[in-house]
């Protein structure tokens, strides 16, 4: 005899479940997304247009080839500059019927006027295979050989996990320059957001941290604020694990940040993902950043972030005024009244 007992959670959040037989738990999942209506195509809401795949060859990364897509909402008008949002691991966000129905959310929130009309750039990590002998190739190949990682995976880590301004310069000077030659995009960071998952999460935070004049709004899912590229390049002293201290001790950046993670995220030789995200959130709170931490019990998965993406976007773009080019981001008054984050051991 099989039976199930379920507690129905709200839409826009992930569900978890398990099976129990003779008093013993087995199977199940922490990450079953429960998409709300804003994650589905709605009657009467116009759909934007996703471009064909575009290939870019980088100078900053010595011939690395990247692919990206441009999403243009139906409301875009060439004579009105649009806001901008850049998605790392971009191909993961482009399927309306997939695990990350991002395009549906963007269409619906623009129609509801919860976010501005925005051009979205979905960019994948690059491939250095065709540029042997270049400094970038040699570094990436050496890193991959050292840690038994593929050339493509090592290129992604070099792009995303390195704590420097190189990647955001690549976006600014190469990719977004191409996009801006085709579409009317706002140049003020007040109108620019960036997001990613895992290493793409720290990459997005790092881009805004390094150049807050380019991006001021950040969403990080299961961000890898860890030591993945720490000391791999002797010229770069910091690793991702250093960001809590950088936030506490360096000049405050005018950025707005949403962090998402779960208690069952990774704990490996590079570090502990839940603790790293909690440490960063605590640092942001102490410095009174405009931030939000959404912390559940999920794993290293997009389920939590994707399920609440409408909420994330609404929060990220709240009080946006297209007549402005700047805003001094301040911590939400409700967050100021809340205590700092505490940690408890739950598995032993």
Language-model region placement:
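Non-catalytic cap/lid and distal C-terminal segments of serine-dependent acyl enzymes
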Residues: 1-348
């Amino acid at each position: 005899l099989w039976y199930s007992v379920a507690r129905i959670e709200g839409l826009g959040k992930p569900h978890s479940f398990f099976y129990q037989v003779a008093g013993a738990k087995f199977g199940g999942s922490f990450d079953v997304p429960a998409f709300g209506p804003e994650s589905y195509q709605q009657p009467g809401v116009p759909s934007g247009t996703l471009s064909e795949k575009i290939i870019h060859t980088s100078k900053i990364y010595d011939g690395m080839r990247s692919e990206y897509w441009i999403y243009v909402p139906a409301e875009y008008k060439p004579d009105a500059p649009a806001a901008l949002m850049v998605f790392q691991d971009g191909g993961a966000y482009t399927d309306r019927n997939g695990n990350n129905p991002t395009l549906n959310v963007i269409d619906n929130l623009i129609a509801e006027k919860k976010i501005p009309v925005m051009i979205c750039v979905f960019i994948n990590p690059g491939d250095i295979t065709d540029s042997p002998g270049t400094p970038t190739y040699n570094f990436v190949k050496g890193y991959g050989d050292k840690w038994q990682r593929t050339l493509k995976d090592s290129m992604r880590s070099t792009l995303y996990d390195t704590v420097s301004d190189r990647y955001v310069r690549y976006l600014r000077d190469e990719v977004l320059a191409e996009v801006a030659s085709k579409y009317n995009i706002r140049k003020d960071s007040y109108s620019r957001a960036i997001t990613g998952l895992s290493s793409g999460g720290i990459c997005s935070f790092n881009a805004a941290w390094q150049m807050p004049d380019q991006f001021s709004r950040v969403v990080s899912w299961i961000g890898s604020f860890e030591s993945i590229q720490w000391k791999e390049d002797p010229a770069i002293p910091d690793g991702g694990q250093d960001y809590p201290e950088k936030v506490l001790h360096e000049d405050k950046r005018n950025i707005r940040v949403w962090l998402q993670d779960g208690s069952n995220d990774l704990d490996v030789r590079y570090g502990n993902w839940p603790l790293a995200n909690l440490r960063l959130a605590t640092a942001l709170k102490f410095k009174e950043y405009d931030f939000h931490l959404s912390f559940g019990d999920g794993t290293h998965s997009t389920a939590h972030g994707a399920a609440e993406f409408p909420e994330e976007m609404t929060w990220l773009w709240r009080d946006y005024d297209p007549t402005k080019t700047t805003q001094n981001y301040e911590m939400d008054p409700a967050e100021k009244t809340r205590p700092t984050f505490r940690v408890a051991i739950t598995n032993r």
